[in-house]
């Protein structure tokens, strides 16, 4: 058996020699005389997780007569053909105990089986782009801690013991066996070539461009006062980092993230944008201190979905919730009918939607307006009279009920998000009320959700689930769900709703939370800024470390354009560029109608200029697309229920295909519906995403395709209507408020680039485009127009 090593550092020399000797002894006693083993040290963090794999072992035994390794288990024989073993090392003195599934720490609990399962999934996902993808693999933790004297080995971890490769090999075979064989990858003639391909692909994916290097330098910079201040403040008061778009809020939050990890603690980073999760992982996985066992980055929806699921709340929704929603719906319809009949009596005609709201907008609560608008539009599409109004009312109610019956059970979390959060908070804040409200004592199925099992009585019946047990289970589940996190960092926290805020404060304590807030100017999800200085109307201690107020992302010439845009539309106050960027940067506005979207020549030229600066493809260009015109998709109906119990029908894309191709590009397609299925972008990929996903991202060059179409799409959206209704005052105009909503989105898009902002206008003659061109001219932007075509002399009419 040939055993090779790759990339072994001095730090791991003794460990690798120990493993090689152990493997040689094992296979010398077997019938496997031919085969190859590769022990790779420091396999790069090329997957979706954090941190390198300290040891990755590939084993291949050719299928030859008399050449085999036999794994015996319960009198059954399994023949080892190919095996991949990953070993992650964890030195953490905060670990105080461990059992068959969980590591226990002063900062929470960790389900290590789940984490190792994630590592295996990440490596298999990565291998799909290699020349021989993995069917299976087995990851292990080798854990050393002074916080616990216990020592043991099981199928997944070696806890405070020596690194016994014979046990690891046995458990790896046990976990990957299938039928009579152990086959983690397909037949290979040259295992070395396969392993080197894996390493080369991993190196290509993790290659660091100049922007990522600079970003890492900024994140890990020593002596920055704010992260030190936040660390000193942990456990005393919530920290709130406030500032405008581009002033460095997310950068400072990642500096805090790094400071917490570097201090030896565990930390969680939450954001609304799935693509920002990818962006942060792309950068932070290059910092050695960040590992899957101490750093976690997720979307808020991911966190709350898993939290509410583990707490058992999702299992409790039933007909009761349906009746509650329908009760609210009927009440709102009856309010509408009273006003409709009153309007008919006064004017002798039935009101349309515009007439109705012009007459009664001051008399109807804004929370009722969404459902009432749907009802009136439904009536408009039907010829109705006093006789048929009651019949149409019943038909509308039945239609809404059928919608809920079909969707509520399958998509309770997404469809009824706010009510799920409300009940999750009730469970945390008042477990006794929750216990009685849902009659938990008789809900035996709830025990399985809460990870509990109880023995039956002698007569075969189950005992009641006592409140004391329930209360204890809540505490244990919260500790498991914290995933070993001392601190939680929340980006763009002005957009959180009240229950998101309250749950996070309950789980982590406000004093262990750090948030960024951009104020009203940067609201996207909601129309009201969340106040993190109060909980249930009670003030909580808060600290406000100052930010510089300067824009470290954009160069001066882009800042000029952005400030002119903001000043013209009065949507935000000006920002200042960093001193070193004075006179640099450019804005290009392309008005050429002959080019749809953008030309490949334009993109390639911009890319080449970025490459000269040392940018990787990931850093170089970020292409922003409107949701129409550049993708094909199939749709199905779904529902969403907001915090006011309004039930809305939405179209969900089940599949999206990017209808842009460029042979010179490796495209990372970020327009898919389920972004959780994507991998972290590689360094050699160019990102194509929707405008709606760009918050918090940056690139050397940003290409805004059909920016005018995006503006008009957002202005006519349901979100814009809600924003207008919520913010409407006596002298405000609804259309102006819709435009304000859309302009905030445009502002977010044009603050993403560092060096070049390229804007392609789909229709240069519309009002928005004309104004953008005017702003561009006044601020020194480059305007690309159609070339003038002059007639020949003999074609002149004189």
Write out the residue ranges for each language-model feature.
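Conserved helicase NTPase motor core
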Residues: 209-242, 246, 296, 314-336, ...
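Intrinsically disordered, low-complexity domain-flanking/linker segments in eukaryotic proteins
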Residues: 64-76, 354-356, 370-371, 723-728
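The start of beta-strands in P-loop NTPase/AAA+ ATPase cores
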Residues: 53, 81-83, 237, 486-487, ...
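Intrinsically disordered, low-complexity Ser/Thr/Pro/Gly-rich regulatory segments
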Residues: 1-53, 57-211
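P-loop NTPase Walker
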Residues: 54-73, 190-315, 748-751
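Phosphate/oxyanion-binding active-site loops and adjacent basic polyanion-contact surfaces
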Residues: 8-16, 108-119, 249, 463-466, ...
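Coupling/switch/interface segments within P-loop NTPase motor domains and analogous charged loops
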Residues: 293, 315-465, 603-613, 618-621
